[in-house]
């Protein structure tokens, strides 16, 4: 079985779109389509139902997804097992658009000679298990579990408190505000279709919404970042929430606005997760770099979820 085709299938399943999977994998959309078609031919079943706006898993696709992920993890472990001491440091950043990727890129710029492999895993449970088994060396995550509930040998440390911002189109009532308080968001429609039950980012925004009496809508399929920006640009009612360091690019005509939140400033708590006893020399270098470059946000005007701790 072609593992590149399996990897492509998993990417499309996660993104819900061939185009977004192509961007994540760094290949053309045509290459993604060919790989999926070859895999479907090899398996003798259709894995996706194509629609004008994306791709939905068929029943067979849903059945194939868990073992496909297991297969890729097994491949990762096999490759790592034959490169002790010489292999690249493997770090999960969730997505290349968000703050963890910037943190890792900053380390790469400071240590350009250190081999790195950027990994993108979906949920914290998968990431922690990958760290535990040695499939990856580290992961950037918001850690919702207390230390006593983490697997033996798993270590975490806070590396970034990232301010959350309001994202609106030019016609929104808050678009012209230089900053607003979380309480001022009450009554406004906040749309975040990427929130998935059970994920750490959903836990963060659920608690944030509850703390300030906000209503967060998750309706509609998640077609990715670009369709979200398109909707916000043309809406006078919908807004969304994003991290300050989330990398977003939109056409000039969209005129989207990023509005700071204050009094208090909600911050998303990014932590680095690794396994005690991991002797990869670059892991220690990464930890030292993150400690030395962590912004000082010791401010009473910050808000974090109760599970985030200090």
Residue ranges, per PLM feature:
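Short helix-boundary/capping micro-motifs
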Residues: 12-26
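Residues within the DNA-recognition helix of helix-turn-helix
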Residues: 28, 35
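N-terminal winged-helix
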Residues: 29-30, 73-130, 140-141
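A short LG(V/I)-centered, amphipathic sequence patch enriched
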Residues: 38-57
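Hydrophobic hinge/microswitch elements
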Residues: 124, 132-135, 194-257
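Ligand-binding "clamshell"
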Residues: 148-162, 177-178, 249-261
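Flexible hinge/capping segments at coil-to-helix
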Residues: 155-164, 168-190
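C-terminal effector-binding regulatory domain of bacterial HTH transcription factors
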Residues: 229, 244-257, 263-310
């Amino acid at each position: 079985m072609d593992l590149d085709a399996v990897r492509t299938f998993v990417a499309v399943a996660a993104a819900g779109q061939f185009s977004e999977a192509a961007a994540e994998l760094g290949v053309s959309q045509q290459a993604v389509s060919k790989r999926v078609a070859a895999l479907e031919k090899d398996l003798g079943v259709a894995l996706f139902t194509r629609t004008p706006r994306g791709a939905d898993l068929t029943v067979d696709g849903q059945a194939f997804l868990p073992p496909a992920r297991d297969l890729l993890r097994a491949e990762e472990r096999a490759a790592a097992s034959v490169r002790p001491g010489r292999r690249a440091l493997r770090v999960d950043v969730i997505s290349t658009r968000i703050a963890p990727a910037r943190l890792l890129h900053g380390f790469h710029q400071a240590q350009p000679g250190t081999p790195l492999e950027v990994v993108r895993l979906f949920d914290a449970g998968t990431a922690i298990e990958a760290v535990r088994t040695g499939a990856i060396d580290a992961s950037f995550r918001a850690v919702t579990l207390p230390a006593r509930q983490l697997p033996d040998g798993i270590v975490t440390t806070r590396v970034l408190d990232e301010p959350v911002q309001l994202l609106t189109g030019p016609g929104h009532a808050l678009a012209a505000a230089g900053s607003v308080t979380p309480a001022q968001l009450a009554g406004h429609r906040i749309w975040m279709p990427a929130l998935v039950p059970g994920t750490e980012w959903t836990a963060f925004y659920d608690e944030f919404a509850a703390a300030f009496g906000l209503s967060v809508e998750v309706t509609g399929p998640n077609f990715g970042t670009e369709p979200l920006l398109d909707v916000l640009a043309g809406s006078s009612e919908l807004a969304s929430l994003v991290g300050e360091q989330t990398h977003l690019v939109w056409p000039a005509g969209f005129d989207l606005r990023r509005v700071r939140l204050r009094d208090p400033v909600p911050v998303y708590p990014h932590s680095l997760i690794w396994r005690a006893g991991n002797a990869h020399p670059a892991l220690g270098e990464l930890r030292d770099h993150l400690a030395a470059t962590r912004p000082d946000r010791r401010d009473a005007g910050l808000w974090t979820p109760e599970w985030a701790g200090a």
